[in-house]
């Protein structure tokens, strides 16, 4: 099975490397305006495959995306230190206007997996440009924020993060919503589990975890310029869900007819992901405060997309 990645920068190359380690694809094609960069990353990653799985990693052109089951869109300009994801919008929408038609010309049946920030608005841009059904344009959304939330809860509770079920919804960015009210550990409500574990969550603990999730990207960008390992692993996991028709539930971004009264907006909700992309949405139970926060997040994203005409 073939997977394409458009954009061979830090996120695109990290995704290709994660795919090689997972071994879910048989061929990964890197496409970039800088052909030497794509070739260098492809060659370097190919040399890792003897230690992992037999994956053919190569650089190519848009035409080489023919037959791809999924294409990751990681093309765009990098986020600057202190720059919000929404501030990237004007600079990256123009990139997609060139990229999306060329991808679909070569791979008209592919699921488009959007990684470029601000990812929720760029998902809406890609959806409008593509003319595809909403489910076939999937943004990485808050998968990484959700992973951070679960990891920090697990660290506090001293349990495996795989046993923590908690979501971050809405924008992948400043207005994201951490859903505390329905969080569970091993099927037990979070606060009940924390008490039984002797690791009660004080207001200070909650504030620390909230800050840890919400500000993680800014801290990483300040320290090393960009985030790529975490999101690369997350994108590879989404590709695996598509290629294997997994039907797992992930907090990915997709065009949504209505969210808390806000119409036609792309944002993250728990969604069932399979071979055709998003196959359904699982709307979680929310507290009144979380519902209002999700509505505000949806409005922010709606306004940003509307300003561009999308």
Curated annotation (Swiss-Prot):
Beta-D-fructose 1,6-bisphosphate binds at residues 150, 165. It catalyses: (S)-lactate + NAD(+) = pyruvate + NADH + H(+). Substrate binds at residues 79, 85, 117-120, 145-148, 227. Pathway: Fermentation; pyruvate fermentation to lactate; (S)-lactate from pyruvate: step 1/1. It comes from the Bacteria. It comes from Thermus thermophilus (strain ATCC BAA-163 / DSM 7039 / HB27). It holds the Pfam family Ldh_1_N. Homotetramer. This is L-lactate dehydrogenase. GO terms for biological process: glycolytic process; lactate metabolic process. Keywords: Allosteric enzyme, Cytoplasm, NAD, Oxidoreductase, Phosphoprotein. One of its GO terms (cellular component) is cytoplasm.
